[in-house]
Amino acid sequence: MTYLQESSRPAVTVPKLQAMRDAGEKIAMLTCYDASFSALLDRAGTDVLLIGDSLGNVLQGHTTTLPVSIDDIAYHTACVARAQPRALVVADLPFGTYGTPVDAFANAVKLMRAGAQMVKLEGGEWLADTIRFLVERSVPVCAHLGLTPQSVHAFGGFKVQGKTEAGAAQLLRDARAIEDAGAQLVVLEAVPTLVAAEVTHMLKIPTIGIGAGVDCSGQVLVLHDMLGVFPGKRPRFVKDFMQGQPNIQAAVEAYVSAVKDRSFPGPEHSF
C-alpha cells in the first residue's frame, strides 16, 4: 500500500497563499496528523495541512496542548509529509520550544527536516525578534494571535480575545508587529468578527480565521472537530461537516467548498 499522491494539482506554496489572498480566493486549512488523512485531505482540495499541537487533545487525550513535545510534532509532521501532499505542510512549535530565537530556530529545523514547509508559533509583539530571526534563516513563519491555547493558564481559560477597546488595539499592534517582522501568514483565533476584519484589511499577508468571522483570508478547523468525532464540548466556531455526507472525503470537500464560497463560517460560528 502506498500513500504517495498521483495528482496534477499544482503544489500550494507560501507565495501561492499570498497570490490567493491577493486574488480574493479563500484558503482552506485543516489539521492533519498522519499519512492516510494527508492523502485524503489533499485529494479533497485542502490548501494547507496543519500539524497542530491540538494533537495533544484529540490524539493524546490531554486537556491542554501544553504537554506536547517537539518530538511529537516532528513525528506527526513526518507522517503527513510522507504522503507527498500538494497542500502546504505547516507544523506547530509547541509550548516551551521558542523562548529564544536560537531555540526557535533549532526546533524549527527539526520540523522542516521532518517535512514542514512553514512553522507556526503563538504570540504577538514580543515574538517579533524571533520571527525575524527565523525568516532571515529561510524558515517561513505563520503567527497565531487572539486565543492562543498555549496561554490558557495566563488567560484563565479558553476565552474570546480582543473584545475590549484595549484588547482590540493590542491585537492590531501585534498583527502589525508580526507582519513587519516577516511573518507570511497569521491565524486569528476566537476574535470578534469586526476586529478580525480590521486586522485582515490592515495586513498585506493572509489571515486564517478560527472563530474569527468570514472576512479572514481563509479558515482552519481541527479535523476531529469538523468530522464530529471528538467527544469533548464543541466550540462555537465548529460545524460538523459529516452530517448528511456519505464519507469523510465528501465531508472534507463540503468544508473546502463552504470556505471557498464564504458560506462558512456563519454568524452562529463567530463572535
Curated annotation (Swiss-Prot):
<comment type="pathway">
    <text>Cofactor biosynthesis; (R)-pantothenate biosynthesis; (R)-pantoate from 3-methyl-2-oxobutanoate: step 1/2.</text>
</comment>
<comment type="function">
    <text>Catalyzes the reversible reaction in which hydroxymethyl group from 5,10-methylenetetrahydrofolate is transferred onto alpha-ketoisovalerate to form ketopantoate.</text>
</comment>
<comment type="subunit">
    <text>Homodecamer; pentamer of dimers.</text>
</comment>
<dbReference type="GO" id="GO:0000287">
    <property type="term" value="F:magnesium ion binding"/>
</dbReference>
<feature type="binding site">
    <location>
        <position position="92"/>
    </location>
    <ligand>
        <name>Mg(2+)</name>
    </ligand>
</feature>
<keyword id="KW-0566">Pantothenate biosynthesis</keyword>
<comment type="similarity">
    <text>Belongs to the PanB family.</text>
</comment>
<feature type="binding site">
    <location>
        <position position="92"/>
    </location>
    <ligand>
        <name>3-methyl-2-oxobutanoate</name>
    </ligand>
</feature>
<feature type="binding site">
    <location>
        <position position="53"/>
    </location>
    <ligand>
        <name>Mg(2+)</name>
    </ligand>
</feature>
<feature type="binding site">
    <location>
        <position position="122"/>
    </location>
    <ligand>
        <name>Mg(2+)</name>
    </ligand>
</feature>
<keyword id="KW-0963">Cytoplasm</keyword>
<feature type="binding site">
    <location>
        <position position="120"/>
    </location>
    <ligand>
        <name>3-methyl-2-oxobutanoate</name>
    </ligand>
</feature>
<dbReference type="Pfam" id="PF02548">
    <property type="entry name" value="Pantoate_transf"/>
</dbReference>
<dbReference type="InterPro" id="IPR040442">
    <property type="entry name" value="Pyrv_kinase-like_dom_sf"/>
</dbReference>
<dbReference type="GO" id="GO:0015940">
    <property type="term" value="P:pantothenate biosynthetic process"/>
</dbReference>
<dbReference type="GO" id="GO:0005737">
    <property type="term" value="C:cytoplasm"/>
</dbReference>
<dbReference type="InterPro" id="IPR003700">
    <property type="entry name" value="Pantoate_hydroxy_MeTrfase"/>
</dbReference>
<feature type="binding site">
    <location>
        <begin position="53"/>
        <end position="54"/>
    </location>
    <ligand>
        <name>3-methyl-2-oxobutanoate</name>
    </ligand>
</feature>
<dbReference type="GO" id="GO:0003864">
    <property type="term" value="F:3-methyl-2-oxobutanoate hydroxymethyltransferase activity"/>
</dbReference>
<keyword id="KW-0808">Transferase</keyword>
<dbReference type="InterPro" id="IPR015813">
    <property type="entry name" value="Pyrv/PenolPyrv_kinase-like_dom"/>
</dbReference>
<feature type="active site" description="Proton acceptor">
    <location>
        <position position="189"/>
    </location>
</feature>
<keyword id="KW-0460">Magnesium</keyword>
<protein>
    <recommendedName>
        <fullName>3-methyl-2-oxobutanoate hydroxymethyltransferase 1</fullName>
        <ecNumber>2.1.2.11</ecNumber>
    </recommendedName>
</protein>
<keyword id="KW-0479">Metal-binding</keyword>
